[in-house]
Amino acid sequence: MSWLLDSDVLSQPAKKIGDARVIRWIEKHQQQCYTSSIVIAQLAFWVRTKRGKQRVALQKWLTELVEAMRGRILGFNVSAAHVWADLQYQLQTTGKPMPVEDSYIAAIARRHNLTVATGNVKDFQRPGIKVFDPFAET
């Protein structure tokens, strides 16, 4: 099985007190883990909200993360755009909207047949995306 890591999961190793269960899970499965350019954008924004030494350290972490995940960062391309349109239509017609960034991540995951690893299970389950919560692992 392969996973698309959401920002709440991927950021755990960079946090002062990251969730040890999630960090162990990432380490155990890192070769089967992907992320998206949308998640990288979310993380880059998060880094920019920090100041001083913390910002410098997080920028270094993000640069190293992008390098380590080279070839496993999936973009929002034309194929994903068509999947996204289908997801958005489904969500709109059922009256269950999803945050736009999460809907892009969901479309990328569906396009590549990946399970989204996130603590935000509720939003990703609505459009029927395969979801795994590493925060709930024991």
Locate each region found by the language model.
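Residues that scaffold the ATP/ADP-binding catalytic core of kinase and kinase-like folds
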Residues: 12-13, 43-46, 84-87, 127, ...
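Alpha-helix capping/helix-boundary segments
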Residues: 9-10, 39, 80, 105, ...
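Short, well-structured N-terminal submotif of metal-dependent ribonuclease cores
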Residues: 1-35, 47-64, 138
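Acidic, PIN/NYN-like endoribonuclease modules and their adjacent C-terminal/linker elements
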Residues: 1-2, 106, 110-138
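Generic structural signal for small/hydrophobic residues in well-ordered secondary structure
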Residues: 6-7, 22, 43, 84, ...
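Residues at secondary-structure transition points
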Residues: 17-20, 34, 38, 53, ...
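Short, structured coil segments at secondary-structure junctions
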Residues: 29, 69, 127-128
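Active-site neighborhoods of divalent-metal-dependent phosphate/nucleic-acid chemistry enzymes
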Residues: 45-48, 71-119
